[in-house]
Amino acid sequence: MVANTSMRLNQVAPVPIQLEDHGPNQLEPTHISDVLVGEHHTIKGENGQSYVVWAIRIIVNDSIYSSIVLYKRYREMEAFRNKLLDEFGNEIPPLPPKDSMSLQKLTNPLAWLEERRKGLQWFMTNVLLNPRWQRSTVVREFVLG
């Protein structure tokens, strides 16, 4: 009985497939349309030291389904800003201060981290949504590297 069923299945012609693209015009250049600096994650390094990485969600072409999520340390964002300064000069906005040993960081670390997140959000929004900077090699390497 099973052999007979599989024979009948083999005799059925496949349904033709037609691919349709309902997305944006492929000739339009890709652009960053939004950026969200989200939660932080504390990572324990190989040497036992802990450090914080930030989740950065980059929305591409106004579609929440086309997004890239990065996890970056503050020092990586600092290096990114320095490369932008080399290419574009002092037009680049500042990052929030490093504050490695601030009183607020020691007494209320969650409030300090939220202030840091807001500062990083402001920086990333001003840099990545600027049409002049977002197409630069520096931004491409930061996002895709």
UniProtKB/Swiss-Prot annotation:
Signal peptide: none annotated. It comes from the Eukaryota. The gene is YPT35. It is found in: Endosome membrane; Vacuole membrane. Pfam families: PX (PF00787). GO terms for molecular function: phosphatidylinositol-3-phosphate binding; protein-macromolecule adaptor activity. Its main location: membrane. SMART domains: PX (SM00312). Belongs to the YPT35 family. Recruits the lipid transfer protein VPS13 to endosomal and vacuolar membranes. One of its GO terms (biological process) is protein localization to membrane. It is a peripheral membrane protein. Residues 32-145 form the PX domain. This is Endosomal/vacuolar adapter protein YPT35. One of its GO terms (cellular component) is endosome membrane. Keywords: Endosome, Membrane, Vacuole. The PX domain binds phosphatidylinositol 3-phosphate (PtdIns(3)P) which is necessary for peripheral membrane localization. The lineage of its organism: Eukaryota, Fungi, Dikarya, Ascomycota, Saccharomycotina.
